[in-house]
Amino acid sequence: MAEAVPEIPPEDKNPQREPWEQWVVDVLEEIKQEALKHFDPRLLTALGNFIYNRHGNTLEGAGELIKLLQRALFLHFRGGCQHSRIGQPGGGNPLSAIPPS
């Protein structure tokens, strides 16, 4: 019986990807800029402060903020975005049912 040839993974000839931490920061910045076009900046500041108080200045906190902003933007667009700024005149506030803390 022939001897098995050991498996060798292919060489990675692609360019090096940016570090994970930098990618998370870049994605958060892009989502934040998009969110500022659609939501009241005070709402986004309050959300950012909440996440910071809960997670501190960590990648976990950045990931949580990314997830929340993605969901908020998805629901906003799904509801028929007319480029209104939610929380200001001309747009309803989907978070109005939540009492302020």
UniProtKB/Swiss-Prot annotation:
UniProt KW keywords: Activator, AIDS, Cell cycle, Host G2/M cell cycle arrest by virus, Host nucleus, Host-virus interaction, Modulation of host cell cycle by virus, Phosphoprotein, Transcription, Transcription regulation, Viral penetration into host nucleus, Virion, Virus entry into host cell
Keyword Transcription regulation annotated: yes
Phosphoserine: modified positions: S84
InterPro entries associated with the record: RetroV_VpR/X
Places the protein is found: Virion; Host nucleus
Domain of life: Viruses
GO annotation (BP), single: symbiont entry into host cell
A GO CC term assigned to this protein in UniProt: host cell nucleus
Subunit structure: Interacts with human UNG.
Protein name: Protein Vpr
